[in-house]
């Protein structure tokens, strides 16, 4: 299946000059969603992954089905104040400024092999922050998996040393 045909391009969103890649049509189409899940799962099958981690919000949408297919758990990473239990946090760099991410303190056990699943790799800021958070609490980031990669933003360059999969690549 050509997932590129299932990704809607919305010009000038969220601001003028941005060509937004919308994954909603994938989520709406059960065959496209199954295909996406299968492709990520196939990539991870032989990597001995113990747990899937996904950043809010679209990382949840793609990470949970992958975890289900691999018969392993899923751990959400969220913005501050959204998780009800004790958390660990990390500050990470954005294009303009910084932000913070949190994970439950019991979300990952020391030494677990983690795959991070998200919808988009752009500048690499968010996934770099998630990776640091996983490593800070003792997990090993074994793979980074994305539905879409915006290659011209060079997020991959920030993630040297990580095993990266992206299903659809766009040049801006």
Curated annotation (Swiss-Prot):
EC number: 2.4.2.7
Keyword Acetylation attributed: no
GO BP: any one term: AMP salvage
Main location: cytoplasm
InterPro entries, alphabetized: Ade_phspho_trans (IPR005764), PRibTrfase_dom (IPR000836), PRTase-like (IPR029057), UPRTase/APRTase (IPR050054)
Protein name, UniProt field: Adenine phosphoribosyltransferase
Source species of the chain: Methanococcus maripaludis (strain C7 / ATCC BAA-1331)
Record has Cytoplasm as a keyword: yes
